[in-house]
């Protein structure tokens, strides 16, 4: 064997090794400096352990060969095991928990699942933009902190349905982030210091343990909350809790679930926030690149909402992000160790047990690959035509192979969206134009001290921005659209021959594509179908029918359910495939240049060499730049179907009888519940917006259109037919051991207005027909007490009966609440149903004048979601939560209801002044009054004076329709006087917390208007009306009939 060379490096000192060669605050920079001094491979000694660093593309290419090397958990990552244990990132090679978790979680990060997360990603991205817009262009923005908030909120919402609301809670970072930053920094430091030094740092160790306990406790709480309140969603948290390993059949232990929750919360946001921060740093340093990027975003996305389909059409944004990660890989190293002693670079021996760190900030600037300007920011080199020509393993910021980043697609989609959205929304500038890049190190890297200013483009205001959906479009995902059977677009139906589909799929994408293709071919007459994983085709490929294969490559290898099939083809032991007719469709991602389409190509070639007949040219879909389903449809039309017709159904075959395509015939009727109420008409939601900021009780604006005219006037009402909240329905189902689709039929007549002799699902019954939240009656309490065998619970129920007003009615305790509290009660479902009133309509005031926007109406309402007064979970308002659940295009059922005659505008608005007094959503009818006055003015009619007194918490939280009212005020339609309970010293509130106080500041004006026969309208709670009346009577004397109230 050729003599091996020793690995160079700085000379270590006894005991401390190379500790003094390392800057403990900037350890990475110290290592990079050594790389420039000692060359492509060097070593140092830390804590008595030899650490080897590789810094060239050639060495990286060798080290990424998974047949020779595998991941090693060393240094700071090993110290991080105190927190994340055997989670996906910190697990040792071959650790059993890693295998179980990896196989369970792979489908959760497939391309289709990531696409489905786009809307939630957009939600958080919009929050960032709203914050920057409202802060104004003079605000200095700590871009790293804001991107940290963004990425942590995104991973929590998209994968676990949990809102951290980091932009609203305070200026401080979320406690999880504070703990994470400490743990990451401490893990890195502990990995550098000698063991004896770490033992002496008792306070630091205790602080580390405290932060670890806090983070694992937060993860445990997420688990407990989801188990206590299950949600029927296909998210990561449910996958962690309920998923089963397809090989062993095992689920994950709670300890492993907690470790992986922490792994995702850290890895899912820390490196992505760094990527975004570095990307915007480089953009502001390179104005020509910034301008080209913005032009690409403007051209592709236009003025409408950004959709997930746009992202694949932004190649320059993609290149910018890749170049940013090349120069500043936010996870700056990963470590491997050899399976057996290996010679590296032809001259260095790497022994078993040695660890080699791939030092990415140097590897990815290798001048032999990227040229003499490798240290410069040049996005063009990352455009596909150049990127695809790079040597293998030249760009590795996401790690390697099976231990590479499982969430790469998630992070990339999120970052693409944020870059595009920010560029389209803002003009950006560095706060300090002379800022020099500094690096903040933990186990990851970020810019240190980099701040920007953001100005809305095109002179747009923050209010205008918030009134438009700036990000997400409701573009349908092909994976979830419905395919209606039928002979569409004149396509010919093929014959009734059988067909077999085989797929190879780890993440579920190729399986979904296979089922989509099978469904479309079903409509063409291929009704005898077999769909199975590729491994089931070993020694089982049919010869009397077409075989369609859809598969992909996973880290250069077959998917788990295709390994046996590929090995069978490669072994040469497979029999001749003469008579097999097949077609292959392959999926891939262009960033894996070395293995792009490797397995689909291999299967196609091996089957052909074994004698099988190709039906069609191999199809291909690139997940990086195209829509997989659209590519599949094109391949089906242009390649597969022509091949099938030619090979299986010759034109002269007289025995060929085309199957009649399946025609789907349906009828659609109104819900049965609608027919049980009088005069309900159908309305369609046309606009939705939230009127408040987090921190204030939520209030919403809902607009809808109805067919035909009505006789409604400003001040009138609408009856709304709601449904019960899904969580309340789930509680009722669970109490009576019913599945949602259990069928219930009422055979006998009953006093309740329920469907007779017609099956209704249990979920529909509890959702649409019964008042589940109605407070229990005294008789209900007596009946419950009579059915319990427990003397103790019987006495408690009778005590509630005796204290009914204070303990039941005042606390809104329902029969369902009591059944959950008193578990010994054995109440039949028939009795439960008989106890409950029928679900009734709810009444809301119109908040839009009927003539203001013909055929359109709106409601302004508070969403009631608060801790239950009886201490049992949360109390959800039935109608308000129903209205809050509606989406654009949703159908609801309403009926007009006139208000009392007095609660309308005076017939002559020219001479009759009005005074309107309200708080919160009590503004609704007065908004319709003011709009009607605006229409009156537009007819060149004079208007008498109008005053609006409006109370809320603060201008930032819940000053409803502020800008709109300001426009009406500027037009002379109304004068507005505000009171702010949280900020009474605000200049608009004149020191007043509540509207009754604000009335006193306008005493003279009110008295003058009263003398001119003004009408006073009040809309709000009973307490508000009482306080207002007391003030007005002290000011005006007896109010008589010109004082009109509407209490809710």
From Swiss-Prot:
One of its GO terms (cellular component) is cytosol. Its cofactor is FAD; FMN; heme. It comes from the Eukaryota. Binds 1 FAD. It catalyses: 2 oxidized [cytochrome P450] + NADPH = 2 reduced [cytochrome P450] + NADP(+) + H(+); an organic molecule + reduced [NADPH--hemoprotein reductase] + O2 = an alcohol + oxidized [NADPH--hemoprotein reductase] + H2O + H(+); dodecanoate + reduced [NADPH--hemoprotein reductase] + O2 = 5-hydroxydodecanoate + oxidized [NADPH--hemoprotein reductase] + H2O + H(+); tetradecanoate + reduced [NADPH--hemoprotein reductase] + O2 = 7-hydroxytetradecanoate + oxidized [NADPH--hemoprotein reductase] + H2O + H(+). In the N-terminal section; belongs to the cytochrome P450 family. This is Self-sufficient cytochrome P450 monooxygenase CYP505E4.
């Amino acid at each position: 064997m050729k003599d091996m060379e020793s690995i160079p490096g700085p000379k270590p000192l006894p005991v401390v090794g190379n500790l003094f060669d390392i800057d403990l605050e900037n350890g990475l920079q110290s290592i990079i400096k050594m790389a420039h001094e000692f060359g492509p491979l060097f070593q140092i000694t830390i804590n008595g352990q030899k650490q080897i660093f590789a810094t060239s593309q050639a060495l990286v290419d060798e080290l990424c060969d998974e047949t020779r090397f595998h991941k090693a958990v060393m240094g700071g990552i090993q110290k991080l095991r105190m927190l994340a244990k055997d989670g996906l990132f910190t697990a040792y090679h071959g650790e059993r928990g890693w295998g179980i978790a990896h196989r369970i979680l792979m489908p959760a990060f497939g391309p289709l699942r990531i696409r489905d997360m786009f809307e939630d990603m957009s939600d958080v991205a919009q929050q960032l933009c709203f914050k920057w817009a409202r802060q104004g262009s003079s605000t200095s923005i700590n871009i790293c902190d804001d991107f940290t908030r963004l990425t942590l909120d995104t991973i929590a919402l998209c994968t676990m349905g949990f809102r951290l609301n980091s932009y609203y809670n305070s200026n401080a970072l979320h406690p999880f982030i504070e703990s994470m930053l400490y743990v990451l920094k401490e893990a890195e430091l502990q990995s550098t210091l000698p063991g004896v030094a770490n033992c002496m740092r008792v306070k630091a160790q205790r602080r580390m343990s405290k932060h670890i306990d806090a983070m694992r406790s937060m993860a445990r709480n997420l688990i407990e909350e989801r188990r206590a309140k299950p949600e029927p969603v296909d998210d990561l948290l449910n996958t962690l809790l309920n998923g089963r390993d397809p090989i062993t059949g095992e689920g994950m232990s709670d300890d492993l679930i907690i470790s992986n929750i922490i792994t995702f919360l850290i890895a899912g946001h820390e490196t992505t926030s760094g990527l975004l921060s570095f990307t915007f740093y480089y953009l502001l340093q390179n104005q020509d690149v910034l301008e080209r990027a913005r032009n690409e975003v403007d051209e592709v996305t236009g003025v409408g909402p950004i959709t997930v389909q746009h992202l694949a059409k932004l190649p320059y944004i993609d290149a910018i992000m890749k170049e940013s990660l090349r120069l500043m890989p936010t996870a700056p190293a990963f470590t491997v160790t050899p399976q057996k002693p290996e010679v590296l670079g032809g001259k260095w021996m790497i022994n078993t047990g040695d660890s080699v760190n791939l030092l990415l900030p140097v590897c990815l600037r290798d001048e032999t690959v990227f040229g003499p300007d490798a240290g410069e920011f040049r996005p063009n080199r990352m455009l596909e035509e150049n990127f695809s020509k790079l040597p293998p393993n030249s760009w590795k910021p996401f790690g390697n192979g099976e231990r590479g980043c499982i969430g790469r697609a998630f992070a990339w989609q999120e970052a693409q969206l944020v870059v595009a959205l920010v560029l389209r929304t803002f003009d950006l500038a560095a706060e300090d134009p002379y800022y020099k890049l500094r690096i903040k190190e933990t186990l990851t890297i970020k810019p240190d001290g980099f701040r920007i200013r953001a100005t809305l483009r095109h002179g747009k205001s923050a209010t205008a921005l918030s009134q438009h959906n700036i990000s997400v479009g409701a573009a349908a995902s092909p994976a979830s659209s419905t395919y209606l059977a039928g002979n569409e677009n004149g396509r010919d139906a093929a014959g009734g021959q059988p067909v077999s589909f085989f797929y190879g799929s780890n993440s579920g994408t190729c399986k979904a594509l296979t089922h989509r293709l099978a469904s479309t071919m079903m409509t063409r007459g291929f009704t005898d179908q077999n769909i199975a994983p590729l491994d089931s085709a070993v020694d089982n490929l049919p010869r009397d029918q077409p075989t369609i294969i859809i598969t992909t490559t996973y880290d250069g290898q077959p998917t788990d359910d295709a390994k046996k099939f590929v090995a069978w083809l490669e072994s040469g032991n497979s029999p001749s495939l003469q008579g097999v007719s097949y077609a292959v469709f392959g999926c891939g991602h262009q960033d894996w240049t070395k293995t792009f389409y490797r397995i689909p190509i291999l299967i196609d070639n091996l089957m052909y060499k074994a004698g099988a007949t190709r039906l069609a040219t191999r199809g291909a879909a690139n997940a990086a730049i195209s829509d997989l389903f659209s590519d599949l449809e094109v391949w089906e039309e242009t390649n597969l179907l022509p091949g099938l017709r030619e090979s299986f159904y010759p034109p002269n075959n007289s025995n060929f009888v085309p199957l009649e395509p399946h025609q789907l015939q349906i009828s659609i009727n109104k819900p049965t519940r609608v027919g049980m109420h009088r005069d309900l008409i159908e309305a369609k939601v046309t606009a939705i917006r939230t009127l408040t900021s987090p921190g204030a009780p939520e209030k919403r604006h809902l607009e809808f259109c109805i067919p035909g005219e009505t006789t409604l006037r400003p001040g009138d009402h609408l009856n709304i037919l709601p449904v019960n909240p899904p969580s309340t329905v789930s509680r009722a189902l669970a109490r009576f051991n019913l599945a949602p689709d259990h069928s219930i039929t009422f055979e006998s007549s009953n006093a309740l207005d329920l469907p007779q002799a017609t099956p209704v699902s249990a979920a529909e019954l509890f959702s649409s027909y019964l008042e589940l939240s109605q407070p229990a009656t005294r008789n209900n309490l007596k009946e419950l007490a009579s059915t319990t065998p427990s003397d103790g619970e019987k006495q408690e129920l009778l005590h509630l009966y005796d204290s009914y007003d204070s303990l039941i009615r005042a606390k809104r305790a329902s029969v369902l609440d009591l059944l959950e509290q008193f578990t010994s009660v054995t109440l039949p479902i028939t009795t439960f149903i008989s106890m409950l009133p029928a679900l009734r309509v709810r009444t809301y005031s119109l908040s839009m004048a009927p003539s203001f926007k013909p055929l359109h109406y709106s409601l302004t309402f508070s969403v009631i979601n608060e801790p239950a007064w009886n201490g049992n979970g949360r109390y959800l308002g039935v109608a308000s939560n129903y209205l809050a659940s509606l989406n654009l295009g949703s159908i609801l059922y309403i009926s007009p209801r006139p208000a009392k005659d007095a609660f309308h505008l005076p017939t002559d608005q020219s001479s009759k002044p009005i005074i309107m007094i309200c708080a919160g959503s009590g503004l609704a009818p007065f908004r319709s009054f003011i709009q009607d006055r605006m229409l009156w003015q537009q007819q060149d009619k004079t208007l008498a004076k109008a005053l609006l007194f409006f109370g809320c918490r603060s201008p930032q939280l819940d000053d409803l329709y502020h800008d709109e009212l300001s426009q009406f005020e500027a037009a002379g339609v109304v004068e507005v006087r505000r009171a702010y309970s949280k900020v009474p010293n605000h200049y608009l509130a004149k020191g007043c917390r509540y509207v009754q106080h604000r009335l006193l500041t306008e005493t003279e004006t009110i008295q003058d208007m009263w003398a001119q026969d003004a009408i006073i309208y009040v809309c709000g709670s009973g307490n508000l009306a009482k306080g207002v009346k007391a003030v007005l009577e002290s000011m005006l004397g007896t109010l008589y009939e010109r004082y009109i109230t509407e209490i809710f």
